């Protein structure tokens, strides 16, 4: 079953994006490079708790 997760900017710590993830197939935390509107640049976004 897919669960909703929140992606947090690693620089300004704003919660910008939500996405889904299959926890059975991917156990590790998700990390993506996405655009942060608050920083106004592409930054690393990590899955929050």
UniProtKB/Swiss-Prot annotation:
Q: Which domain of life is it from?
A: Bacteria
Query: What are the GO cellular component annotations?
Result: cytoplasm; ribonucleoprotein complex; ribosome
Please provide, alphabetically and separated by semicolons, the GO molecular function terms listed in this UniProt record.
structural constituent of ribosome
Q: Which keywords annotate this record?
A: Ribonucleoprotein, Ribosomal protein
Q: Which SUPFAM superfamilies match?
A: Zn-binding ribosomal proteins
Biological process annotations from GO: translation
Matching NCBIfam families: PRK00504.1 (NF001764), PRK00595.1 (NF001860), rpmG_bact (TIGR01023)
Name of the protein this chain belongs to: Large ribosomal subunit protein bL33A
This protein's species is Acholeplasma laidlawii (strain PG-8A)
Q: What's the encoding gene here? A: rpmG1
């Amino acid at each position: 079953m897919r669960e909703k997760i929140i992606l947090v900017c690693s620089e300004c710590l704003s919660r910008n994006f939500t996405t889904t993830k299959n926890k059975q197939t991917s156990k590790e935390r998700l990390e993506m490079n996405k655009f942060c509107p608050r920083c106004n640049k592409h930054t690393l976004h990590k899955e929050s708790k």
